[in-house]
């Protein structure tokens, strides 16, 4: 029976376009992982969507004098365009502004309330005297009490990741007008994390330390070490999921965004199932089996600033609800810097995805963001390094290997040649191919994407060396049988590398698949469909049918006699002049 895999990906606020840090931090790693499991033939569901209730959206709406829905309709389509351009293959990328999400969130709230894991309590809320209203946490900024960062948000510090309440900040102020905030009492519902703490601790102790990343465990253990306390799940807001209780005091309050956003993984799975015509299919990924075990392995791809929400709060909600599968792994990535400096949207020091997705081949961007990805430590986008690695690794190593082998074969044989007797050199490359296939498989199973990509590229280097030593371009003139054997071995290595690179480089892998004489698709791409939002206006989702790639993860069995198509280069060499051009673009737009 094939494995069942849930790939749950962080929900971005629909208040601005993606920069490359977002892509490297969650969306591209998730896509590589999902594509790999589909190639294995595993039942794979990859879901996410635009977080429509985040405070940044309401801030943008208030500043522009428009509605939150207007902000969402401006930026949600840009997400879909970027995902299509880069081949991010969601089974469903939706929104939290849907009837389905409101229904699932309401059910989660009521079940937790029924099971005794929610309670009411009066708390102190941030209040603007100048505006005469309560302020959401992210409408408040101040100095972080933990690290001293001067622009910490009311709920979390972007610098150190510390979670806190607005009243913990030093000199808190409103982001709307800069005025100091005061604090008033207001009643809200709380998630009883203290009551759930014993079960959470037992779960954390049960996870396999061999695959959870060290930083993910450290963040989680530090939270538990401090002890858990109740966390408010409602706020004095006008925009969001209504609080489903018959209490006039909560008529003008809404469910807090951090609570409803994580439910999105669950609600998106339900929406996907309904869209496929099998409304109960989501249960295959979520509902525990009769023995209490999970029906699937659930992987949550996020940035490190979201670790506590996915290793403490969301698991607590799942435990409190009952009979829903807990995360199997939370591969949280670190941050991607830009030219040695932390990206800053306020300073516009960022490399925005829409700015580069049309200027460079998608596989060049994908390659660099994985090869240089922030898996276990912060990494850095450098234009000089981007050009150097694309040219020396993607073009001169892998692209050159594929082009040389196909060109010589097509010119001299027109098809995959019939091999003769193998030599030790042939057998060594065949063995290296087998070993690399096994090691890349194991690394991808463990979500070690950088290492897996490096192993595949190392095999391409080995195959290039084999070609240089065997010189088939000379052999074709005086020893056709030996030339045929060398090219056959090289073609099968290239064919296997096509598969190994496919999760990382789907566009060029599909092209190579066709050049090698295959029909069909090994790298299906997503597409946009239209549905309807709760306000009756059109709503766009990203989806796709990826079944065509199932079972393609295997060592090459490329048969002799299969026609080879006239090859063209898979990748474009980059002119070094673009380094200065791109750096100039960055400096021209930065705000000091």
UniProtKB/Swiss-Prot annotation:
InterPro entries: aa-tRNA-synth_I_CS (IPR001412), Anticodon_Met (IPR041872), Met-tRNA_ligase_1 (IPR023458), Met-tRNA_synth (IPR014758), Methionyl/Leucyl_tRNA_Synth (IPR015413), MetRS_core (IPR033911), MetRS_Zn (IPR029038), Rossmann-like_a/b/a_fold (IPR014729). GO terms for molecular function: ATP binding; metal ion binding; methionine-tRNA ligase activity. Gene3D superfamilies: HUPs, Isoleucyl-tRNA Synthetase, Domain 1, Methionyl-tRNA synthetase, Zn-domain. One of its GO terms (biological process) is methionyl-tRNA aminoacylation. Binds 1 zinc ion per subunit. It is found in: Cytoplasm. GO terms for cellular component: cytosol. Keywords: Aminoacyl-tRNA synthetase, ATP-binding, Cytoplasm, Ligase, Metal-binding, Nucleotide-binding, Protein biosynthesis, Zinc. PROSITE patterns: AA_TRNA_LIGASE_I. ATP binds at residue 345. It is an enzyme of class 6 (ligase). It catalyses: tRNA(Met) + L-methionine + ATP = L-methionyl-tRNA(Met) + AMP + diphosphate. A motif ('KMSKS' region) lies at residues 342-346. Its EC number is 6.1.1.10. Is required not only for elongation of protein synthesis but also for the initiation of all mRNA translation through initiator tRNA(fMet) aminoacylation. PANTHER family: METHIONINE--TRNA LIGASE (PTHR45765), METHIONINE--TRNA LIGASE, CYTOPLASMIC (PTHR45765:SF1). HAMAP family: Met_tRNA_synth_type1. Monomer. This is Methionine--tRNA ligase. It comes from Roseiflexus castenholzii (strain DSM 13941 / HLO8).
